[in-house]
């Protein structure tokens, strides 16, 4: 939800550009009220999309990616995966189509992305410089971004979660 909130505030996108897919009807109702398209169907959400952001719990990544694999256009669509602790090798395996895998980006924002104040860590996987710039431009609109090696991603995850942990203590 936080990433969609930030994208809705972005100057790069209009609400009509954004489709949110979720299994939770109140979440869909909220984003529909903001002008985004909403659906319960992940495959439907992928049709016609230039950028697909899979933002799920780590244990849901495999099922989600395998569920959209057949409708992904590896040549024209950009894929962002936001999930802690999921190696790119696993994602490649899950998305393999006869030896072909998509370009994708491992991305770890923090909760401040909803307010366009995130420090977002990005690991390009088989991406060109041009593709990487397109993705960093989007996340720079939502705060700041830093390109990093995948081996450093666990540290990025810890840093991204630190804000949420601190907010939990403040709330207590």
Language-model regions: role of each:
Residues 1, 29, 62-66, 89, ...:
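Alpha-helical elements of the RecA-like P-loop NTPase motor core of helicases
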Residues 1-40, 44-48, 117-118, 141:
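NAD(P)+-binding Rossmann beta1-loop-alpha1 motif at the extreme N-terminus of oxidoreductases
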Residues 13, 74, 126-127:
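Alpha-helical structural elements of signaling/regulatory helical domains
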Residues 21, 39-41, 107, 148-151:
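Conserved beta-strand termini and adjacent loop/short-helix elements that scaffold enzyme active sites
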Residues 25-26, 59-60, 86-89, 130, ...:
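Short alpha-helical
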Residues 34, 42-54, 58-122:
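Rossmann-like NAD(P)(H) cofactor-binding subdomain of soluble oxidoreductases
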Residues 90, 94-103, 119-156, 166-172:
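Internal alpha-helical scaffold of NAD(P)-dependent oxidoreductase catalytic cores
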Residues 161-165:
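Alpha-helical transmembrane segments of helical membrane proteins, especially in multi-pass transport
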């Amino acid at each position: 939800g936080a990433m969609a909130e930030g994208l809705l505030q972005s100057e790069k996108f209009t609400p009509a550009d954004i489709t949110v897919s979720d299994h939770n009807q109140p979440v869909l109702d909220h984003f529909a009220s903001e002008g985004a398209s909403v659906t319960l169907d992940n495959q439907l959400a992928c049709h016609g999309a230039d950028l697909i952001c899979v933002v799920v719990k780590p244990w849901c990544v495999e099922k989600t990616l395998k569920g959209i694999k057949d409708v992904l256009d590896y040549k024209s669509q950009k894929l962002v995966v936001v999930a802690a602790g999921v190696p790119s090798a696993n994602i490649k395996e899950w998305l393999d189509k006869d030896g072909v895998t998509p370009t994708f980006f491992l991305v770890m924002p923090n909760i401040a992305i909803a307010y366009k104040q995130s420090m977002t860590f990005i690991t390009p996987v088989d991406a060109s410089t041009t593709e990487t710039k397109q993705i960093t431009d989007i996340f720079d609109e939502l705060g700041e971004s830093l390109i990093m090696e995948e081996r450093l991603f666990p540290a990025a995850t810890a840093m991204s979660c630190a804000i949420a942990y601190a907010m939990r203590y403040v709330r207590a």
